[in-house]
Amino acid sequence: MSLARTLFIVLPMVVAALAVLILVADRIHRRPIVGAGLVMCAIGFVPVWVMIPVEPNVPPATLACFLVIIALLPGFSWRLTSGDLMVATAWGLVGLSVAAGSPLNYVLSDLVFGALPAYLAGRLLVERLGLRRVAEVLAIVWIAVSVLVLLEAVTTINPFSYITVHNNLYEEWSPPLARGSLTRVEGAFGHPIALGVCLAAGIPLILATCWRPGYRIAAGALVLGATIPTFSRSAIACAVIAVILSLMQVHTNIPALWRMGFLTVLVGVGSVLLPYVLGVFDSAGREQEDSAGYRGDILVLVRQLNPLGLSSAYQKSGDSVAWGGYSSIDNHLLLTALRFGWIPVVLIMAGLLVYLARAFIQRSNPAQIALLSLIPAYGTVAFITQIGTVVWLIAGMAASAQVSVLLESRNNTTGGGVGVVAGHANPWNRIRSGDWSCRAFAGRSVRPVSGADAGSH
């Protein structure tokens, strides 16, 4: 085919695609809630193997994050927190690690097309919409994903596996996995662990929406239940921790009776399901033991870490990579340290410790609780498929919500330190003054009430 004919066919397609992208970006700029929905739907309903066949291969959720950045970055306030500076420092060290021998493709895949767009998207969306409105969008998508997952568990049919794209990612992630004699659910996430961990990350945000307590608890229970047929110990543990940590926080705003009832039902149902789940794990037998043993064996690679740059354990033969003889590193903290050095990892872990301290003194926001609930996963699974996008998206949401805490301190207000709405008047001030409406939680303007009405609260 001649060059002229190729251009005649390709150029109109490129122009049409650009026109669509511009229209979508403009829509997101005018209504940021559209951007939140686009990102959440790309995570929950588009498999990672569905991507444009052009190098570099960019996951669909990352493309959605880039669209949000293009649309909302011009209006960014540039109010930065200590968390932003810590993350930026860690990323800067990751960039410098290239000079210390780290391959550039690791920086591109993990940072440029991974952590960076997801973090910025979460940061921008929460600044424009407030944490609870973004949480509501996530909750709706996560509920839909959970329903599909439970249907998949009953029927053993995963409709997303029928979305055929002839590439290496489809061959790697579309085949179903089993534990013992049972097929594990995967949804659009390509792996049971990825599905379960991402669902668990959404539970604190679901419980922090402005819905009625019963609706929030039902949604949280549904998502928690959807992690069980993944038969992933890490995912189930993360989900349980997410529920417990969320119910311990005052910002959840769920009455004590509802909390106790939820925990009682959780313990009761858990005691019934636990023998069944343990039976599935026992039927896996050697597979489960080998998996746990392997995760312990790879810890010997800690001895070969460098402060900055590629580990001496790096081995490459053709297209295959190994680390000290281990071809797979099921530990994201360790894998990151092997690729870029242990200093960036220590910085991120220090940030998690700060979030943990804030949780103990009731000063954390729901996104921070979500990050804390995933602690069991950070050391037991790599950030495969959509996990990295979800973690860094929530990290950006947590940082943006924290901005409102700084505004409270600067303005000598008493907003409660939860960072519900960043960049706007904190609604907790209204709540403390007696306004318990959903509008206050969403950061919308509230019509002033008369003295008589105010006294009726």
Per-segment meaning from a language model:
Residues 1-75, 96-98, 332, 374-378, ...:
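N-terminal signal-anchor transmembrane segment
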Residues 49-58, 100-112, 191-193, 217-248, ...:
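Helix-loop-helix junctions and helix-breaking kinks within/between transmembrane helices
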Residues 278-340, 355, 359, 363:
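Long extracytoplasmic/lumenal interhelical loops at the membrane interface
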Residues 20-21, 244-245, 258, 339-375:
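Hydrophobic transmembrane alpha-helices and their immediate junctions
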Residues 147, 152-157, 247-286:
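A membrane-periplasm/extracellular boundary helix in multi-pass inner-membrane enzymes
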Residues 67-71, 370-375, 384-435, 439:
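Transmembrane alpha-helices of multi-pass inner-membrane enzymes
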